[in-house]
Amino acid sequence: MARGLLVVFEGPEGAGKSTQLRLLADWLGARGRDVVAVREPGGTIIGDEIRRILLDPNADIVPRSEALLFMASRAQLVEREIRPALESGATVLLDRFFLSTYAYQGVGRGIPEADLRAANTIATQGLVPDLTLLLTMPVAAGLARAIDRGERDRMERADLEFHERVARAFEAFATREWQEGHPECGPIVLVDANGTQPAVFDRVLGTLHTRWPGTFPGL
């Protein structure tokens, strides 16, 4: 059986990645594709407990602990959910992965890239995404969306300067030079997240068609 595809959705707060992931999961499922949709942190019993700790607005977590908690959730998710699904031939849609670690804990929190890289090697055991869809939009607009969703979690409550650093980092990650120096992240494509959900979803589908013409039914 052919290995499945791992497609990651990334982006700053409020960019709509989780919404677009759900839309794609539904779209592929309706066309007979075996789809597994998971998120970071979370996706397993242990991962969900880690997620609760990480996003608790009252939790006092130092940057190194934050990074290692994300890695622990990732290791569990890769071993228990992602690899088995890929080996069964399923398309795995993942809400955040190592790119978020580089952006939030690396550029945002100031943890050295070499340290994050070493920890990620342990967590993923060399698993590389087949494609990362990086949704982009202005920071202020994204944070406004996050606020409209209701009470903000610990990550969303970080100051504007932090979120601006993260957003700039994400955009830098899409450059060819950065990707060539970070093969563990796989190919990264920017997707404009401005506009209506259907308009953004059309861009997502267009990106998949360009990357894998004929692979997905209905594209």
Model-predicted regions and their roles:
Residues G14:
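Walker A (P-loop) phosphate-binding loop of P-loop NTPases
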Residues F9:
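Hydrophobic anchor at the beta1->P-loop junction of P-loop NTPases
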Residues K17:
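Conserved lysine of the Walker
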Residues Q20:
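Hydrophobic positions on the alpha1 helix immediately C-terminal to the Walker A/P-loop
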Residues W27-T124, F201-R203:
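ATP-dependent small-molecule kinase phosphotransfer cores
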Residues A2-L6:
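Pre-Walker A (Motif I) flank of P-loop NTPase domains
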Residues A25, A140-L219:
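NTP-dependent small-molecule kinase module
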Residues T101-R168:
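A glycine- and Lys/Arg-enriched "phosphate-lid" helix/loop adjacent to the NTP-binding pocket
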